Amino acid sequence: MSFRKYALITGSNSGLGFGIATRLLQFYQPRLQDEPEVFTVILTCRSREKAEDACRRLKEFFPDRKIRLEYVLLDLSNMASVEAAVQDIATRFPKLDFVYLNAGAWDLEGIQWLKAIFSTLINPIQALTHPTFYKETAGRVSNDSLGYIFESNVFGHFYLKNRLAELKVLRSSTKVVLTSSLVAEKKSLDFEDLQCFHGEQPYQSSKRLLDVLHYAELEKGLPFEQYLVHPGLCTTNMYETFLGPILVMCAKLGFYICRLLGSPWHTISPYVAAFAFLWTALHATKEDQSIKWGAAVTRFGHERVLSTPVELILPSEQEKALEYMTKLYQEWKKKLVS
């Protein structure tokens, strides 16, 4: 049916991805059993068990609504899995109206506690918005011999969207939403080491590269609409995996304090953070593609969307990043597509 809409959300079994799925279903799915289904949400997860669990929880969350959920298996750190997902999506779905490229990885090695304590006491908003006390695992390489964080956060999605565009699953009206970050800082990205094999901040590097690529692609021209959005600062499963429940509670307390002190970016809840991603689907126009949008809140938690400054990106940086990614894409496409 031509009126049916399809939304693909990567990394949707928990955290922000699950929040985005919840928001979309709340808005689109009918309550009455005799109303037609017009919206399909396609979840991507690494395993069948996680996907089926996410579908079950979403259905339990909306007991009085007609829910249409599908899932695709996808591991962004495995390029063979990415190509398999491309083929699965192209075979099963005629088009995609919304594509949320949300899944990603963060590899935390530890916390510099003295630095964390003193920086938080001196300037809590700065310390908990742009933290400098996390120590990331440097130099991790995937089984594809790519930078693990680079592949998981940038290249896997770059390959996915370009292949889907080639197969005409993405149309001119499709809205592709990239998940950026507040920590996408210029200093973290080395253009001589775009995969961050040698850098100490692979996560920040990957998010800055994502920003650079977005503007490079807009400049060149895309066959679909593409938006750059970040979730503010919310506590997801990545926090819980590395910090544990007690430290996550402490982090949430710190985030609430920052919010009361006036920080707009401490969204805390993935559901609240997902508001900006829903707004993009419903209200963003082509003119909004040039702005980096962010999920934000008032002191008392009222949701809003704010534009976010992006540090200067030079034309030469855009050109170098896009040329590198395009070449890598062609290399992997040749390997994976018979």
From Swiss-Prot:
Binding residues for NADP(+): 16, 44, 50, 75, 203, 207, 236
Pfam families: adh_short
One of the GO BP terms on file: ergosterol biosynthetic process
Pathways involved: Steroid biosynthesis; zymosterol biosynthesis; zymosterol from lanosterol: step 5/6; Steroid metabolism; ergosterol biosynthesis
UniProt-listed Gene3D superfamilies: NAD(P)-binding Rossmann-like Domain
EC number(s) given by UniProt: 1.1.1.270
Gene Ontology MF, one: 3-beta-hydroxysteroid 3-dehydrogenase (NADP+) activity
Catalytic activity: 3-dehydro-4alpha-methylzymosterol + NADPH + H(+) = 4alpha-methylzymosterol + NADP(+)
A single Gene Ontology CC term: lipid droplet
PANTHER family documented for this protein: 3-KETO-STEROID REDUCTASE ERG27 (PTHR43647:SF1), DEHYDROGENASE (PTHR43647)
Leftover remarks: In Aspergillus, the biosynthesis pathway of the sterol precursors leading to the prevalent sterol ergosterol differs from yeast. The ringsystem of lanosterol in S.cerevisiae is firstly demethylised in three enzymatic steps leading to the intermediate zymosterol and secondly a methyl group is added to zymosterol by the sterol 24-C-methyltransferase to form fecosterol. In Aspergillus, lanosterol is firstly transmethylated by the sterol 24-C-methyltransferase leading to the intermediate eburicol and secondly demethylated in three steps to form fecosterol.
Name listed for the protein in its UniProt record: 3-keto-steroid reductase erg27
This protein's encoding gene: erg27
